[in-house]
Amino acid sequence: MSSYFVNSFCGRYPNGPDYQLHNYGDHSSVSEQFRDSASMHSGRYGYGYNGMDLSVGRSGSGHFGSGERARSYAASASAAPAEPRYSQPATSTHSPQPDPLPCSAVAPSPGSDSHHGGKNSLSNSSGASADAGSTHISSREGVGTASGAEEDAPASSEQASAQSEPSPAPPAQPQIYPWMRKLHISHDNIGGPEGKRARTAYTRYQTLELEKEFHFNRYLTRRRRIEIAHALCLSERQIKIWFQNRRMKWKKDNKLKSMSMAAAGGAFRP
């Protein structure tokens, strides 16, 4: 054993100077000193602490024997009044494992009892709340059915009153007289202003009949205009406009013809 290890042990504990090792040859004196120190320090540090083990890593042929170690551990165990399950040896190589307690000997702690009691109370309260919720839902369903029956009664009474009352007569259609209708309907008003008149496209038969009538008489009377309008399925206004346009064209043609004839006659004048 080195003096450095012993000096460090003496400086760590308050009663270290009382247990300085001066005799390195006597095994019994050294074991007795360490046995007393273990018994004194075990109560101070708790859990069966038996001081510092100075025989770590030593073989059986070292300074301390196995019998001395057994006696020192026995003295430390008798000095420590702690329970066997709380005793912790310094090293696992010098003391056996404590026997585990049987399951029957382990009594439930009051904390676990209170925990189980809290769980039971929670389960009971949840069951009571579920029962209350079911009764509340059933009561609400009962109220809903009652209110639905009350709502059905006024609806049926309203239907009966509606059936008993006579239905109002539909509004009469306004009567349309013949002069209100358009005789010649054209769909050329798309995209144009409302007051603009659409261009009327005449058929070949209508144009031929109008040309023959214009050849006989360039001006029409009111009676003849009505006859032509009924014969050609046209309106009087359309007949009048066609004759106006045809006369303008005839005057233009005659004017050009007369101007050309006058120009031709002046050229041949000597």
Swiss-Prot record:
Location of the motif Antp-type hexapeptide: 176-181
Location of the region described as Disordered in the Swiss-Prot/TrEMBL record: 75-175
GO biological process: anterior/posterior pattern specification; bronchiole development; cell migration; cell-cell signaling involved in mammary gland development; embryonic skeletal system morphogenesis; epithelial tube branching involved in lung morphogenesis; intestinal epithelial cell maturation; lung alveolus development
Biased composition regions of type Low complexity, renumbered to the chain: 75-87, 119-134, 154-166
Compartments where found: Nucleus
One GO cellular component, as annotated: chromatin
One Pfam family hit: Homeodomain
Keyword Transcription regulation in record: yes
Keywords: Developmental protein, DNA-binding, Homeobox, Nucleus, Transcription, Transcription regulation
DNA-binding region: 195-254
Keyword match Transcription regulation: yes
GO molecular function: DNA binding; DNA-binding transcription activator activity, RNA polymerase II-specific; DNA-binding transcription factor activity; DNA-binding transcription factor activity, RNA polymerase II-specific; RNA polymerase II cis-regulatory region sequence-specific DNA binding; sequence-specific double-stranded DNA binding
Membership in a protein family: Belongs to the Antp homeobox family.
Function field: Sequence-specific transcription factor which is part of a developmental regulatory system that provides cells with specific positional identities on the anterior-posterior axis. Also binds to its own promoter. Binds specifically to the motif 5'-CYYNATTA[TG]Y-3'.
Subunit structure: Forms a DNA-binding heterodimer with transcription factor PBX1.
Name the record gives this protein: Homeobox protein Hox-A5
UniProt lineage: Eukaryota, Metazoa, Chordata, Craniata, Vertebrata
